[in-house]
């Protein structure tokens, strides 16, 4: 098949880029040629059905390759996760021209924009999420106590672990910021008989959580509100405990202090706050492809910047735990469930969306496996609390 000079130039550039990733052997395929990278039997094949413009690769390797995969111009023959794990393990070899990507990378963190960003991801449809999440509808990192724990068991473990860390007592009040479909608050109400309030910006989650409260007869214990965290101080709220699981990533770097200010205003003196969030070793604007297609307003904070902001609100750290590998395993479960239900998903979305979602789950799993991002839980008190046990009680 005839190749243009431009295609040959782009092919050469792509090979020169990929031949740096020599840790594991793999093949690169083009229309009329094939290249063997590394020593030994290839473990996967990168198949370019169409070359990628050099200017796109220079601007952002991640965005160029991600969009090519979504279009079907690029395919992975073999295990997608293992291929991505190989490349992301050598993340320093990717390139990003941040000034050229400024529009994508730095979006507004206004209330209106953040509501739009949250609903664009979480309001895709409950029926879709039910296909690949577990029965609890937990869309956050599980906690695998045993190697063979199911995804469902890991999510139950995670919630139990968080509730133990919060040192709950019957009759206490608990706020869940970014409550999702409500499993954490439902478990807290059943096991500890607390009075809980959940807030979310997702209409789909709000509707499903309301239904769950009614179905399980928990109307006297739980309420859910469509509310932005910035509106919490406007209400006459005072909670014994506050928890936020997987929501901080949507807040934006400019608003971390504001977020913690809002928590401080509604948490009673001596109260406990557990913050569960994806983090990075250092401050970084984020991955261009993820920012454009998955979490438009998302930013991954560093652990150190959150600790610095906490001090401004007199939050005292009790414990910090990293659950990075638990998220890797959670994502691999999600990916398997997603692929197991691909025929049903084809009736809901087009091929581009499904390829995008598969890439998202696999890439995130590989990112956690390589320590590019972490998952931290910080347990803290508002001011000093000398009434808690002196050793870890969970």
Label each region the model flagged.
Residues 230-242:
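A short acidic, Gly/Pro-enriched loop at the edge of an enzyme's catalytic core
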Residues 1-155, 161:
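Feature captures hydrophobic
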Residues 170-178:
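Conserved class I S-adenosyl-L-methionine
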Residues 270-278:
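Conserved beta-strand signature within the Rossmann-like core of class I S-adenosyl-L-methionine
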Residues 217-230:
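Conserved SAM-binding strand-loop segment of SAM-dependent methyltransferases
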């Amino acid at each position: 098949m005839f190749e243009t000079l431009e295609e040959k130039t782009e092919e050469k550039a792509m090979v020169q880029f990929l031949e740096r990733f020599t840790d594991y052997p793999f093949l690169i395929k083009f229309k009329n040629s094939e290249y063997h990278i590394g020593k030994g039997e290839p473990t996967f094949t990168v198949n370019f059905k169409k070359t990628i413009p050099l200017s796109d690769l220079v601007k952002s390797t991640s965005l160029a390759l991600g969009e090519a995969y979504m279009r079907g111009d690029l395919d992975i023959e073999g295990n997608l996760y293992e291929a991505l794990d190989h490349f992301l393990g050598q993340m320093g070899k990717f390139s990003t021209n941040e000034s050229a990507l400024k529009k994508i990378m730095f979006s507004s963190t206004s209330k209106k924009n953040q509501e739009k960003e949250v609903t664009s991801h979480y309001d895709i449809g409950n029926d879709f999420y039910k296909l690949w999440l577990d029965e609890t509808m937990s869309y956050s990192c599980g906690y695998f106590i045993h190697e063979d724990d199911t995804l469902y068991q890991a999510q139950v473990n995670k919630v139990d672990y968080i509730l133990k860390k919060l040192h709950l007592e019957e009759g206490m009040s608990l706020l869940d910021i970014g409550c999702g479909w409500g499993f954490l608050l439902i478990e807290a109400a059943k096991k500890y008989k607390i009075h809980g309030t959940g807030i979310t910006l997702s209409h789909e989650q709000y509707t499903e959580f309301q239904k769950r409260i009614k179905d399980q007869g928990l109307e006297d214990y739980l309420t859910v509100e469509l509310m932005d965290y910035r509106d919490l101080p406007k209400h006459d709220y005072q909670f014994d405990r506050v928890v936020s699981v997987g929501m901080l990533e949507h807040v934006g770097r400019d608003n971390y202090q504001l977020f913690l200010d809002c928590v401080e205003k509604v948490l009673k003196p001596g109260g406990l706050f557990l913050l569960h969030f994806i983090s990075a070793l250092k401050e970084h604007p984020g991955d261009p492809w993820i920012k454009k297609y998955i979490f438009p307003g998302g930013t991954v904070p560093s652990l150190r910047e959150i600790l610095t902001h906490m001090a401004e609100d007199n939050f005292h750290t009790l414990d910090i735990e990293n659950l990075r590998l638990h998220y890797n395993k959670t994502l691999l479960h999600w990916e398997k469930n997603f692929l197991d239900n691909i025929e049903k998903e084809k009736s809901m979305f087009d091929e581009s969306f499904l390829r995008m979602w598969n890439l998202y789950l696999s890439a995130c799993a590989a990112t956690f496996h390589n320590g590019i991002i972490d998952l931290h839980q910080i347990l803290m008190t508002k001011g000093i609390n000398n009434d808690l046990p002196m050793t870890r009680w969970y």
